[in-house]
């Protein structure tokens, strides 16, 4: 039994460049409209620390419109998850430019008290933004998917109500940050964890529902659509040699010729999405009684066209595959 969760990381670029209007507000509005068309719920992973700093520093007048959009999405039944890039926590905005602390790029590598401060700030911002003093996020996604070393961050997040994480993508690795999700490949469609997010633990307190991935030849990832998205960032050069160097740097994290391809409706072509879903359905036919949560991912900053996500939702509707949220799925996982 397949249940698909459509998630979007709701944020601007990680170095602070780009406008809220172009990278968050407008793409999210069109995505919400597309979800409404197909009557599907959405999970928005809101980069709360980023927005808190933008509001505090008065860096972008569109922040009020973003907050209004979040409130409307929340009131309309979409799920709001917590997403944190800690380099924003004490960021400053001077002369039209953000100065972020990239030494604090991985939340999990910060001192315990620092993690507490960052998470507290993020949750308080969300309560105020949603005008709901009782708001408690059920679901978390780590910035840049960095959720190792898992403790003490997991315990702190648990204390704030987090019961589901969706940071892992099977086969993923970030050598620079000491993150390795390759051992999660055989963990199943979801699992409980505590000490290490990639290690299944029967009595774990948090459930991991990973971003769906499949291992593919690295060369198959170099498509015109992905390259166009990379070009759109202000910190990627447009010359061909630089593009190739950028991709090679990504693949240095892997010792084989296989690369984990996320189910990413911003970066995948219609054909890639179709093939991925056909494989998932084929696998489900072997054990239709088994619950198989499938997490698709996108980023507002990457949402340049809507043909792929519209096709994905159409495909799911045609094949009568349920689209849900983490919150709605949670009772079935206990």
Where are these regions (language model features)?
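Generic structural signal for well-ordered alpha-helices
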Residues: 28-32, 66-71, 116-126, 154, ...
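Active-site beta->alpha N-cap acidic-glycine motif
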Residues: 1-76, 296, 302-304, 313-322
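Active-site-adjacent pocket scaffolds in enzyme catalytic domains
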Residues: 142-287
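A structural signal for the main folded, soluble domain(s) of proteins
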Residues: 36, 129-134, 320, 326-330
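Active-site and substrate-binding clefts of carbohydrate-active enzymes
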Residues: 202-214, 288-334
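Metal-dependent polysaccharide deacetylase catalytic core of the NodB/CE4 family, i.e.
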Residues: 41, 48-146, 204, 208, ...
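Acidic-and-aromatic substrate-binding clefts and catalytic sites of carbohydrate-active enzymes
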Residues: 14-26, 48-65, 88-92, 141-150, ...
């Amino acid at each position: 039994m397949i249940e698909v969760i459509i998630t979007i990381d709701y944020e601007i670029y990680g170095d602070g460049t780009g406008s809220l209007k172009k990278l968050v507000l407008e793409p999210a509005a069109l995505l919400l409209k597309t979800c409404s068309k197909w009557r599907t719920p959405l999970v928005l992973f809101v980069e709360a620390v980023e927005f808190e700093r933008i509001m505090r520093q008065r860096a972008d007048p569109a922040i009020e419109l973003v907050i209004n959009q979040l409130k409307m999405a929340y009131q309309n039944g979409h799920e709001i998850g917590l997403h944190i890039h800690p380099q924003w926590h004490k960021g400053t905005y001077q002369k039209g430019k953000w100065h972020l602390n990239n030494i604090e790029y991985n939340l999990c590598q910060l001192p315990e008290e620092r993690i507490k401060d960052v998470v507290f700030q993020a949750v308080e911002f969300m309560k105020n933004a949603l005008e709901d003093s009782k708001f408690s996020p059920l679901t978390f996604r780590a910035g840049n998917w960095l959720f190792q070393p898992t403790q003490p961050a997991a315990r702190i997040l648990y204390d704030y109500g987090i019961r589901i994480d969706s940071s892992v993508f099977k086969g993923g690795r970030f050598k620079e940050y000491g993150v390795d999700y390759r051992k999660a490949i055989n963990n199943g469609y979801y699992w409980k964890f505590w000490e290490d997010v990639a290690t299944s633990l029967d009595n774990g307190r948090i459930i991991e529902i990973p971003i769906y991935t499949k291992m593919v030849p690295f060369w198959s990832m170099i498509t015109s659509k992905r390259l166009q998205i990379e070009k759109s960032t202000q910190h990627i050069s447009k010359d061909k040699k630089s593009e190739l160097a950028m991709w090679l740097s990504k693949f240095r994290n892997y010792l084989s010729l296989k690369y984990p391809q996320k189910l990413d409706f911003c970066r995948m072509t219609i054909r890639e999405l179709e093939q991925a879903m056909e494989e998932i359905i084929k696998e489900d036919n072997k054990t239709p009684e088994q619950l198989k949560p499938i997490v698709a991912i996108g980023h507002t900053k990457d949402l340049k066209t809507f043909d792929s996500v519209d096709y994905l939702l159409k495909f799911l509707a045609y094949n009568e595959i349920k689209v849900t949220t983490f919150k709605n799925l949670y009772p079935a996982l206990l």
